[in-house]
Amino acid sequence: MAAPFLQKDLGLSDAQMGMVFSAFTLAYAVFEIPAGWMADRFGPRLMLTRVVVWWSVMTAVTGVAWGFVSLLVVRFLFGAGEAGVFPGLSRVYARWLPGTWRGNAFGLAVMTGLIGGAITQKLTAEILARTDGNWRLVFGVYSLAGLVWGAVWYWWFRDEPSQHGKVNEGELRLIGTGEPEMQGAVPWRSVFTNRAMILLCGMYFGVIYGWYFFLTWMPKYLLKTRGFDLKSAGWFAMLPLICMAVGVAGAGWASDGLVRRVGRKWGRRIPGLVGLPIAAVLVWMASSTLDARAAAFLLAAGAGFATFGVAPGWAACLEIGGAHAGVVTGTMNTFGNLGGTAMPLVAGLCLKWWNSWDVPLMTVAFFYLFSAVCWLGIDATDRIGSGEDEVVVGRSEGAR
C-alpha cells in the first residue's frame, strides 16, 4: 500500500519500481536452496530466528532509502535474508506433525500470514492518510513486530518435540517418528530429475507469478487505473489477501481429507486442478470489465481460487523430500520466487510501453492454467532418492 507513495517521493518510474519489487524476489529465489539446506542442517529454531530478525532490520532500513539504487540494494538484501522461512517451517511440520495433518498446517500458516497482510494493507492506508503519505514511518513501525516475534520464538521453540517440556508422552506418540534428520549428502541429482519435483517447481512458478501481482502492483492498479480513493483502495487491497487466506486454509484442510479417502496422489492433486482454472477465468473477466468494483471483486475471488494448490504443494514437498524436506521445499520455493521476480518486471515494462494492465493480467491467467496442467503429473508418493540407498521413515500414514 505504501509503494505508490514511495515511488512518487523517490521519483521512480514504473519500470524502476518493477525492478525494486523483483530485486526482493530474485534474492529470495537465489538464496532459498542454501537456506533450505541450512534449515535441514541447523534446525528451524535457529534458522527462523535469524530469518525474522534479518527481515525486521531490513524493513527498518527500507524506510531510510534515498533513491533507486539504495532501495534496490536494500530490497535485495531483504530477500536474501528472508529466504528460508518456508523451508524452516517445513522442518517444523516434518518433525512436529503426523503426515496427514501437514496440508492443513501449511494452509493455516499461510492463511495467518495472509490475514496479517490484509490487516497491514488497511492499517498502512490509515497511517498514510493520517500522516500525509509518510511511508518511511510505516516501515519503522512494522520492523518492531518481527524483533519481538524472533525473541519469543527462540525462547519458546525446540527443534524436537521430545526436547520441549510441555509435550507429553501421548502427544509424542501421536506425532510419531515424523521425518528423520538429514542423513548424509543431499541426493541433488534426484532432486532435479524427479518428475514430481520438476512439476511442483513449474506449478509454483505460475502460482507465485500471479500472487505477486496482488502483493506488489494491486494498490497502484486500484488507485491509478480503477480510480479508488486511498481509504477505499485500502479495503479493496485487503480483499484478495482475505480470499487467499480462506482459499489456502480450506484447500489444505480439504487436501488432508482427500488424502485419507483417495490417497496422496489424488488427494494432493485435486484442489489445484479445481481451483486454478477457475482463477484463470476470473482474472480474465476482471481485466475485461469496465466496472471498478466488479473488477476488484473478481480479482479477489481469482486470488482465492489460485491458492488451492499452495498448501497441497507444500505438503507434497514434505512427502517427496522426506529427510531432505528443507532442500526440497527450498527448491520449489526458488522457482516460485522466480515467478515472483518475473511478474513485477513484466507489469512495469507493460505499463511503460503500453500504459495498460491487459497484458499483465492475461499473463496471470495464462500461468494459472499452466499451473493447473502441472498438477496433472504431480505424484506426492514419488519420493526423491527412492532408487538410492537412503533411509525413509514415516511414509505409511495415508500413503496409497
Where are these predicted regions, by residue range?
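Glycine-rich segments within core transmembrane alpha-helices of 12-TM secondary carriers
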Residues: 103-122, 128-129, 244-248, 333-343
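Helix-breaking motifs and short loop linkers at transmembrane-helix boundaries and internal kinks
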Residues: 11, 43, 64-70, 81, ...
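Cytoplasmic helix-loop-helix junction between adjacent transmembrane helices
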Residues: 74-113
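Conserved MFS/SLC helix-loop-helix module at the cytosolic interface between two early adjacent transmembrane helices
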Residues: 30-69
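Structural signature of the two symmetry-related core transmembrane helices
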Residues: 46-61, 266-284
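Extracytoplasmic gate region of multi-pass secondary transporters
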Residues: 194-251, 310, 314, 318, ...
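A membrane-interface helix-boundary motif in multi-pass transporters
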Residues: 129-144, 229, 267-270, 349-367
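Helix-loop-helix hairpin linking two adjacent transmembrane segments in secondary transporters
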Residues: 109-164
